[in-house]
Curated annotation (Swiss-Prot):
Source lineage: Bacteria, Bacillati, Bacillota, Bacilli, Lactobacillales
Segments forming a coiled coil: none
The protein's name in its UniProt record: Ribosomal RNA small subunit methyltransferase H
Uppermost EC category: transferase
Organism: Streptococcus pyogenes serotype M4 (strain MGAS10750)
GO BP term, pick one: rRNA base methylation
EC assignment: 2.1.1.199
Keyword Nucleotidyltransferase in annotation: no
């Protein structure tokens, strides 16, 4: 793995092993990132198997061209530089209308967090950017400096679940009236200034939730995940599986709800037989989310909030 794209893969074996890999199968890594999951999955495929890898970050694909070279040379890998919300259309265009499994590792990859100029981190001074796709137009700068007060409050509450959303939005509104807010440090200091002193003594950085909220807005992360996971569930073959790693409650809630809707049946009480078209199409492989082991948590602090949910298609 190239030094500039160092990424420790979370829940590596659990995520891939629970896909119950068929050596000749067709699989998708919807979030290539540091290519850790892809490399492990490819090690389980025969030369007849194939993996399609999505990422909207060209650096992730460039890195994978090196780390997965032996599989690329055998024609087992296809890279697709795009947001995974376009997964179904892009696969269909390649003649793929059914897959045996897919995995998602949602959120920001370590290299994106560590690359100062990307503007994802409140711990490093950088321009307000936060774009996962460097070619997209909306940046954190636009959100912070142009969104109306009420829109900021809504985003901070909805995506950051921060109870001081109004106070923070007001502080931002006051500051940008004097001059634009240009850097992550400026924004982090404004967030700290908007919170009461006792709040600042609590564990964790006071800007964490607001930075998360802005990042989700800039990249439409939840909208993209919702669309993509639903499309992936449609594409799955019978007995195909989907693994989703989430890192915060909003992603986990979304995944849990989508899996629940597909794996439960809502029929009137007393109905003697469940109509065929009302039967569940999925079953949960694990009733509760799978969490990182103690040893993984010790080795990788970024794994602390990770949760893995897995579902299996039982009816087309």
């Amino acid at each position: 793995m190239t030094k500039e794209f160092h990424h420790v893969t979370v829940l590596l074996h659990e995520t891939v092993d629970m896909l119950d890999i068929k050596p000749n199968g067709i699989y998708v890594d919807a979030t290539l990132g540091g290519s850790g999951h892809s490399a492990y999955l490819l090690s389980k495929l025969s030369e007849q198997g194939h993996l399609y890898c999505f990422d909207q970050d060209q650096k992730a694909i460039d890195n994978a061209q090196v780390t997965l070279k032996s599989y690329i040379d055998k024609g087992q890998v296809t890279f697709i530089k795009d947001n995974f919300r376009h997964l179904k259309a892009r696969l269909t265009a390649l003649g793929v209308d059914e897959i045996d499994g897919i995995l998602y590792d949602l959120g920001v990859s370590s290299p994106q967090l560590d690359e100062r100029e990307r503007g994802f981190s409140y711990k490093q001074d950088a321009p307000l950017d936060m774009r996962m796709d460097r070619q997209s137009l909306l940046t954190a700068y636009e959100v912070v400096n142009t969104y109306p007060f009420n829109d900021l409050v809504k985003i901070f509450f909805k995506y950051g679940e921060d109870k001081f959303s109004k106070q923070i939005a007001r502080k931002i509104e006051q500051a940008r009236a004097i001059k634009p807010i240009e850097t992550t440090t400026e924004l982090a200091e404004l967030i700290k200034a908007a919170k009461p002193a006792k709040e600042l003594k609590k564990k964790g950085h006071p800007a964490k939730q607001i930075f998360q909220a802005i990042r989700i807005e800039v990249n439409d992360e939840l909208g993209a995940a919702d669309e993509s996971i639903q499309d992936a569930m449609e594409l799955l073959a019978l007995d195909g599986r989907i693994s989703v790693i989430t890192f915060h409650s909003l992603e986990d809630r979304l995944t849990k709800q989508l899996f629940k809707e597909a794996s439960t049946v809502d029929v009137p009480k007393g109905l003697p037989l469940i109509p065929e078209d009302m039967k569940p199409t999925f079953e949960l492989v694990s009733r509760k989310p799978i969490l990182p082991s103690h040893s993984e948590l010790t080795a990788n602090k970024r794994a602390h909030s990770a949760k893995l949910r897995v579902a299996k298609k039982i009816r087309k």
